Amino acid sequence: MKNKILLLSIVLLFTGSVFAQKADMSLIPYRIGDVWGYASADRSIVIKPQFEDAELFYEGLAVVKKAGKYGYINTAGKIIIPLKYAKVTHFRFGYFPDSKNTKPADGDLHDEKKVLFAGASLTVDGYEICIGAKGQRMPKCPAIPENSATDLNIPEKVVVKTNYSTIQKSDLFDKITDDYKMVPGAEQTYYIATRANNYGVINNKFEVVLPFEYSMIKKKNLGGMTYLLAEKNGMHGVFFGNGSPYISVENTKLQPVSAKNGANYFIVAKDGKTGVKDMTHKYVVESIYSDITYDQTSNGFILTGADSTKGFWFITGKTVEPKYAELTVLPGGEFIKVKTQAGKWGYINSQALDFFEE
């Protein structure tokens, strides 16, 4: 196996989100009162609630807490690694390089030994070590495969800029800043231009299709068609690429969102209320919230109530109304983790079903 590796420091073990890895969502932590167990997707209890805390399963093992100490159980609920640690991380795979097969020139490895490991410490401020799947201490920490550090593997974006300096200034405009076609392959070309510090749009016949009265105009491709995001006097709206109105310029906030399910939405705010519209102008999230943000790690929108409480709208169409003190979205969009006003955490699935009981 030929893999480049990224060396792991002990410090990185406890950052949690540095390296992406999928959890096993077939068993979900389930809380009854103050104790945690595990339930299947239909909320049937599989592992009896008995722990002070319980995390998701990774590679067949899950972190649990009892009597103030952390350890690990398997999917049958059996304690595999004793509950004796002050802090731990979930298990993941790493590699021990074979030093005989290391290229001196660039450090590439021909052969590696794949190992399952986690970070652990016997005291909160103590020395952090790596342990194996049976709880044994490793002499050193494994390396992390470079392809698991997703933020390091995003290809650089190539931005092609058009030089408009050859287009002479005229009485119609001062400068062209961008161009576009309504749809790929269309004959008509449109130009975003400025005049007297205001933005407008002209076509290739030098006809004004959007007057020069906006403080900002930007193009946005949604569903294969070009739209124009416009701002005037602090208000935001959207036009079709040909200048026809789409969403009136009367919103204090307007944010286009291309969701992971392929659908496109607009977060719109007016008169202090925020909602979400689909491409047919229908409100899929009613305009009653103080703020809404799209969560990039999932398929949904975080809702903020007037009292700063948090809720969530799943792409499935289900709404969890704002009433929680905190909210964390789990990658994949199937679950959120919420903190109640009483300070207790719990999981909710994309059908808005609670995996906890008070």
Mark where each language-model region is.
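Sec-dependent N-terminal signal peptides
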Residues: K4-F14
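Residue-level detector of conserved, function-critical positions
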Residues: Q21-E358
